[in-house]
Amino acid sequence: MNDRLTPELVLSAYCQGCFPMADPETGEISFYEPDPRALIPLDDRFHIPHGLKRALNKKPFELRMDTAFPEVVHACARTDQPEEQWIDGQIEEAYGKLHEMGFAHSVECWDEEGLQGGLYGVALGKAFFGESMFHRKTDASKIALVALVQYLRAHRFLFLDTQWTTPHLLKFGTYEVPAKEYRKLLKRALEEQ
């Protein structure tokens, strides 16, 4: 692992509002602090699209947490678009160590054929930083996201940070806050246990 990307450095970066990504071409690790920052609401503004509600009612997957963390990260790293491969071996190793330390977590969707989708991220205080998601079967990553939101609500988290807004995440009510406001929210979330 690159000496620069220790678990302690990654945690310190999160506490300052930054997160690491590997350059898909060079493998160089850089830290980012988007302005504005995208958050998924954990209150009644969280929206489950109608079609997904139908899928949830069918209960197509068994939901698990932290039973296949390395597999989830590795699946998130595999993408058909090389320009989007920001998760490299250094990232996988650092987050694996964060998982062993109790900071990084996965939400997984399983069926009789195995792991079909999931997501992973980092929990610090009452903040959760969503990193990436994947699916092998329809709606698996979305169902994992809904399960994560339910978990975060039950444990009184203040926010779910998705870093940037995407069309996919907008369907769930994602909103943006200026970096200055984000840092205030982050400070409050880190002070709460």
Swiss-Prot record:
Role noted for this protein: Functions in the N-end rule pathway of protein degradation where it conjugates Leu, Phe and, less efficiently, Met from aminoacyl-tRNAs to the N-termini of proteins containing an N-terminal arginine or lysine.
Among the GO biological process terms of this entry, one is: protein catabolic process
Catalytic class of the enzyme:
transferase
Lineage of the species this protein comes from? Bacteria, Pseudomonadati, Verrucomicrobiota, Verrucomicrobiia, Verrucomicrobiales
Q: What highest taxon heads this organism's lineage?
A: Bacteria
Q: Which organism is it from?
A: Akkermansia muciniphila (strain ATCC BAA-835 / DSM 22959 / JCM 33894 / BCRC 81048 / CCUG 64013 / CIP 107961 / Muc)
* Reactions that this protein is recorded to catalyse: N-terminal L-lysyl-[protein] + L-leucyl-tRNA(Leu) = N-terminal L-leucyl-L-lysyl-[protein] + tRNA(Leu) + H(+); N-terminal L-arginyl-[protein] + L-leucyl-tRNA(Leu) = N-terminal L-leucyl-L-arginyl-[protein] + tRNA(Leu) + H(+); L-phenylalanyl-tRNA(Phe) + an N-terminal L-alpha-aminoacyl-[protein] = an N-terminal L-phenylalanyl-L-alpha-aminoacyl-[protein] + tRNA(Phe)
Q: Name one GO molecular function term.
A: leucyl-tRNA--protein transferase activity
Q: What protein am I looking at?
A: Leucyl/phenylalanyl-tRNA--protein transferase
Q: Which Pfam families match?
A: Leu_Phe_trans
Q: Which keywords appear in this protein's UniProt record, sorted alphabetically?
A: Acyltransferase, Cytoplasm, Transferase
Does Acyltransferase show up as a keyword for this record?
yes
Transferase among keywords? yes
GO CC terms of this entry: cytoplasm
The subcellular localization recorded is: Cytoplasm
Give the E.C. number(s). 2.3.2.6
Q: Which SUPFAM superfamilies match?
A: Acyl-CoA N-acyltransferases (Nat) (SSF55729)
> Which protein family is it in?
Belongs to the L/F-transferase family.
**Classification via NCBIfam families:** aat
